């Protein structure tokens, strides 16, 4: 067992590098967008036209990652127009994350300027103007209130990425400490906000209820972190960052396989707990159709994230690290 507090990961610390990724027990069914093929045809040209990725080699590597595949899993209930623009927002987010935030090129001041629509930065910089153009497109096919909520959650996601980049995660972290340090940077609170633009909104009484807030923050978000960390671990073994709980648990338990098994057990526990929260909400708000719709969407997003993450055709988890990510490997 590890006694020293470590702040960096070294794959060579483990003599036995063999491990089997566990098959998680998923209680819900996944869906897939019927517009995947059609929107895929235009997606490449749209990304290229944004000029968000300056190097041709980086552009080709990004397209190879097939992020639209994950988007097609996460947003299967959207009609074609909503899916087109939600997909564009998600592609934009992936690009900003990979090339502007994860390697610490940009910081909090840059993000705050990005979300000030009247700022000189937005008016003069295509990175800002593209984002607001996407939001306008979403408003045109969705509803204003839900898009305002989406803008807020997009901002919160970027804030979390920057905050986590500044955190000193160490090998003694409990899972709760780790999830608190990650905030919402895994992106699935943002993902849920994306689905809200085309479904009836929850009333404020439910949206602001302590049980609903607790369910999202302490169960829904950690479940996605567990999925992310288990299935992205292969890709992240080269990075010295401890930003994956498999790495932290491996140091604590002395084995990568024991760490994988531990996260699998945590996943089962959190799935059980979130189901209890669903039942509690349905008891507090009986026969509420909007709540039923939102809980169904939440279950579907979890199942879809899981199924895409385990799909060998999804290179973002099964492929090589992007050049932008390689820059931070030995920091």
From Swiss-Prot:
A motif (NDxxSxxxD/E motif) lies at residues 228-236. The keyword Amino-acid biosynthesis does not apply. Disulfide bonds: none annotated. This is Terpene synthase 8. SUPFAM superfamilies: Terpenoid synthases. The keyword Ligase does not apply. Keywords: Lyase, Metal-binding. The gene is TPS8. GO terms for molecular function: lyase activity; metal ion binding. Terpene synthase that converts its substrate farnesyl diphosphate (FPP) into several yet unidentified sesquiterpenes. Its EC number is 4.2.3.-. Contains several highly conserved motifs that are important for catalytic activity including the aspartate-rich 'DDxx(x)D/E' motif and the 'NDxxSxxxD/E' motif, both of which are involved in complexing metal ions to coordinate the binding of the isoprenyl diphosphate substrate in the active site. Pfam families: Terpene_syn_C_2. It comes from Dictyostelium purpureum (Slime mold). Belongs to the terpene synthase family.
């Amino acid at each position: 067992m590890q006694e020293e507090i470590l702040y960096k990961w070294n794959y060579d610390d483990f003599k036995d590098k063999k491990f089997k990724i566990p098959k998680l027990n998923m209680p819900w069914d996944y869906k897939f967008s019927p517009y995947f093929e059609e929107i895929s045809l235009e997606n490449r040209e749209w990304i290229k036209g944004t000029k968000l990725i300056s190097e041709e080699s980086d552009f080709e590597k990004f397209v190879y990652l097939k992020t639209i595949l994950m988007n097609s899993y996460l947003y299967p209930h959207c009609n074609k127009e909503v899916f087109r623009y939600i997909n564009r927002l998600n592609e934009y987010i992936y690009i900003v994350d990979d090339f502007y935030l994860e390697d610490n090129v940009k910081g909090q001041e840059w993000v705050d300027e990005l979300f000030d629509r009247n700022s000189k930065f937005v008016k003069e910089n295509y990175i800002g103007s593209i984002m607001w153009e996407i939001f306008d497109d979403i408003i045109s096919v969705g509803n204003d209130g839900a898009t305002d909520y989406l803008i807020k959650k997009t901002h919160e996601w970027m804030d979390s990425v920057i905050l986590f980049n500044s955190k000193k995660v160490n090998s003694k972290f409990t899972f709760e400490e780790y999830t608190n340090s990650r905030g919402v940077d895994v992106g699935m609170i943002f993902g849920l906000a994306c689905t809200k633009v085309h479904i009836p909104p929850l009333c404020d009484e439910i949206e602001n209820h302590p049980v609903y807030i607790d369910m999202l923050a302490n169960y829904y978000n950690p479940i996605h972190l567990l999925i992310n960390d288990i299935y992205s671990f292969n890709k992240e073994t080269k990075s010295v960052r401890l930003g994956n709980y498999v790495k932290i648990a491996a140091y604590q338990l002395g084995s990568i396989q024991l760490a994988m098994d531990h996260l699998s057990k945590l996943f089962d526990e959190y799935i059980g707990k979130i189901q209890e929260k669903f039942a509690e909400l349905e008891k507090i708000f009986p026969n509420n159709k909007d709540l039923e719709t939102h809980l169904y969407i939440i279950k579907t997003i979890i199942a879809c994230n899981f199924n895409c993450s385990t799909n060998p055709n999804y290179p973002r988890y099964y492929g090589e690290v992007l050049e932008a990510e390689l820059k931070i490997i030995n920091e």
